[in-house]
From Swiss-Prot:
Pathway involvement of the protein, from the record: Cofactor biosynthesis; coenzyme A biosynthesis; CoA from (R)-pantothenate: step 1/5
The encoding gene: coaA
GO biological process: coenzyme A biosynthetic process
Protein name according to UniProt: Pantothenate kinase
Protein species of origin: Latilactobacillus sakei subsp. sakei (strain 23K) (Lactobacillus sakei subsp. sakei)
Localisation: Cytoplasm
One MF term in the entry's GO annotations: ATP binding
Top-level taxon of the source organism: Bacteria
Membership in a protein family: Belongs to the prokaryotic pantothenate kinase family.
Alphabetically ordered keywords of this record: ATP-binding, Coenzyme A biosynthesis, Cytoplasm, Kinase, Nucleotide-binding, Transferase
Top EC class for this record: transferase
HAMAP family, per database record: Pantothen_kinase_1
C-alpha cells in the first residue's frame, strides 16, 4: 500500500482481502453479472470478489456510520429522527464503465440489505432534450456542463435528500439519443440512492449548490484516455450492429452506411467532444472522489485509491 498525499494507493492484490471476513454475503451468478454489465464492459465474478465485495464492505461501514450520525444529530436537536437516504455518486468518462459499476453496487447492496430500498439513476436524464440543445445552439456540446439542466438536477436531489417522495427523474434513451417524452424513473423513499454520471463531481460556476453536496460517498472510474477511446469505438461498433435492423434507432443511418465513414465520424466525435470534455471538465474532478477505481487493459481494475480524509 502506497501512501500518497491525499489517497492510499492499494493494489488489487491487497484490496481483495478487505472484504469483511465472516460477514454474510450472498453471491451473484454469471447470469446476474451479465445483466448488469454494460455494452462492451468486461467484468467477471473474480472482479466482483476481488474489487466489488471489498468496496461493498466499505460502503456498508460508511452507511452504518451515516445512520448512526443521523440518529445522534436528531438526539442532539431533540427531534424525531428523519429518514435521509445515503447517496453514492459515481463519476468518470463516457465508455469507462460507470453504469456497470453503479448497477453492480446496487445489486450487491440490495443483497446485503434485503430489507432496504436501493435505487439508481443516471444524470443523462437531466440533459436538455435535443430540441432544447438546438435552440440553445449547443447541440455539438452535448455532455458538456452547459448541456445539463443543473437547477432541475439539484432540485431533484434536494427533494430526494429531504425524503419528499415520490420524486420523478426524466428518462434518457441511448437508442434515440434523446430524452424520452413523458417517461420517468420514480425514486420513492430509498434508503440508498446511486447517482451515476459524467458530471456528478463537477463544480459549475453558475451554481451555489453542487451535485456532490448531496453525496455521502463518491467513486471515480478512471482509465488512460487512449484506452477509453478504444472502448468508445468498440462500443460504437456494437451499437451499429444492434441498430442495423431498426430504422427508429439513432445509429441506424450509420449502421447501414459505409462502416469506415461511420468510424471516421465516431473518431471525430471522440476527439472534438468526448476527449475535450474529459480533459477539461471530467478528469479535473477525479481528485474530489472518495475512492478511485483505476482500470487498465480489458477493463481490468488494477488498483484502488482511497481518500485518507
Amino acid at each position: 500500500m502506497k501512501n500518497e498525499m491525499n489517497y492510499y494507493e492499494i493494489s488489487r492484490e491487497e484490496w481483495r482481502y478487505f472484504h469483511g471476513r465472516g460477514e454474510k454475503y450472498t453471491a451473484i451468478t454469471d447470469d446476474e453479472l451479465q445483466q448488469v454489465s454494460g455494452l462492451n464492459d468486461r467484468i467477471s465474478l473474480t472482479d466482483v470478489s476481488d474489487i466489488y465485495v471489498p468496496l461493498r464492505h466499505l460502503l456498508q461501514m460508511k452507511y452504518e456510520q451515516f445512520r448512526e450520525n443521523q440518529i445522534k444529530q436528531s438526539e442532539f436537536l431533540e427531534i424525531k429522527p428523519h429518514k435521509t437516504p445515503f447517496i453514492i455518486g459515481i463519476a468518470g468518462s463516457v465508455a469507462v464503465g460507470k453504469s456497470t459499476t453503479a448497477r453492480l453496487l446496487q445489486l450487491l447492496l440490495s443483497r446485503v440489505y434485503p430489507d432496504k430500498t436501493v435505487q439508481m439513476i443516471t444524470t443523462d436524464g437531466f440533459l436538455y432534450s435535443t430540441s432544447e440543445l438546438k435552440q440553445k445552439g449547443i447541440l455539438d456540446k452535448k455532455g458538456f456542463p452547459e448541456s445539463y439542466d443543473m437547477p432541475q438536477l439539484i432540485s431533484f436531489l434536494n427533494a430526494v435528500k429531504n425524503n419528499v417522495a415520490p420524486v420523478k427523474a426524466p428518462k434518457y434513451s441511448h437508442q434515440i439519443y434523446d430524452i424520452i417524452p413523458d417517461e420517468f424513473d420514480i425514486i420513492d423513499d430509498p434508503d440508498i440512492l446511486i447517482v451515476e454520471g459524467i458530471n456528478v463531481l463537477q463544480l459549475p460556476t453558475t451554481e451555489q449548490i453542487y451535485v456532490s453536496d448531496f453525496f455521502d460517498f463518491s467513486v471515480y472510474v478512471d482509465a488512460n484516455p487512449s484506452l477509453i477511446e478504444k472502448w468508445f469505438l468498440e462500443r460504437f461498433d456494437l451499437l451499429l450492429d444492434l441498430a442495423k435492423d431498426d430504422p427508429t434507432n439513432y445509429y441506424y443511418p450509420y449502421a447501414i452506411s459505409d462502416r469506415a465513414s461511420a468510424f471516421k465520424m465516431a473518431r471525430r466525435v471522440w476527439r472534438d467532444i468526448d476527449l475535450r470534455n474529459l480533459n477539461d471538465y471530467i478528469l479535473p474532478t477525479r481528485n474530489r472522489a472518495d475512492l478511485i477505481l483505476h482500470k487498465t487493459k480489458h477493463h481490468l481494475i488494477d488498483k484502488v485509491f482511497l481518500r485518507k480524509y
